[in-house]
């Protein structure tokens, strides 16, 4: 009797593990995209919000502005939709 209880418990835990693993794999699927970044010289003032507004139409998630060698550079980051 003890062997059947242990076997039933093991099978139950194994089934639960496989179900949870399958659910996590389904949730992990993301739409196709290209991870990466691009950079361009910002024509206006250096502002992260303006960079984000410029990057969104190109499909990137966010933008950050940095001043490099006295030139405002806007860098787009995130997942670009394919």
UniProtKB/Swiss-Prot annotation:
It comes from the Eukaryota. The keyword Acyltransferase does not apply. The keyword Secreted applies. Residues 1-28 form the signal peptide. GO terms for cellular component: extracellular region. It is found in: Secreted. Its main location: secreted. Keywords: Antimicrobial, Disulfide bond, Fungicide, Plant defense, Secreted, Signal. Belongs to the DEFL family. This is Putative defensin-like protein 191. It comes from Arabidopsis thaliana.
């Amino acid at each position: 009797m003890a062997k059947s209880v242990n076997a039933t418990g093991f099978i139950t835990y194994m089934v639960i593990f496989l179900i949870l693993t399958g659910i996590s794999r389904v949730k992990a699927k993301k739409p196709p995209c290209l991870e990466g970044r691009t950079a361009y010289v910002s024509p206006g003032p250096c502002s992260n919000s303006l960079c984000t507004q410029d990057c969104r139409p190109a499909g990137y998630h966010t933008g950050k502005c940095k001043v490099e060698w006295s030139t405002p550079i806007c860098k787009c980051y995130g997942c670009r939709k394919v």
